[in-house]
Amino acid sequence: MNAEINPLHAYFKLPNTVSLVAGSSEGETPLNAFDGALLNAGIGNVNLIRISSIMPPEAEIVPLPKLPMGALVPTAYGYIISDVPGETISAAISVAIPKDKSLCGLIMEYEGKCSKKEAEKTVREMAKIGFEMRGWELDRIESIAVEHTVEKLGCAFAAAALWYK
């Protein structure tokens, strides 16, 4: 084994793309609403492996590729489910990209009883604060959000799905 490679990483290839997705749905049950939101976001037929909030260095933000059904997809996500008719719920995800491309990016997720605009503003501010905490220079922030007005039982979902070129 190459002495420069961390033994853990010798077994796992780091993802090199990130796709920001968001969706919402109504459902008969909370799980059906969540599943519908995943389908609406384009990632309903894969297995999400929930990760914390780090984007590998030099990973690119790309449109969601066609993922193989059943694939294990590392994903940072936020979601909210509500059964209050008329309530507005939103979910948002952001990725902060460093100026120094040898550093990792930072993914932040947010969900709340608020507008899409408020959720996206909050998640972008969280990414900025995360970079300030690390003392890193920010190049840019990419984000996406979704808003849903509950009819009976609804879900809003936003995610950063990591994958491979």
From Swiss-Prot:
Cofactor(s) named in the record: pyruvate
Keywords: Decarboxylase, Lyase, Pyruvate
MF-aspect GO terms: arginine decarboxylase activity
Thermal properties of activity per the entry: Thermostable.
Ranges that cross the membrane: none
Subunit structure: Trimer of an alpha-beta dimer.
Name of the featured protein: Pyruvoyl-dependent arginine decarboxylase
Taxonomic placement: Archaea, Methanobacteriati, Methanobacteriota, Methanomada group, Methanococci
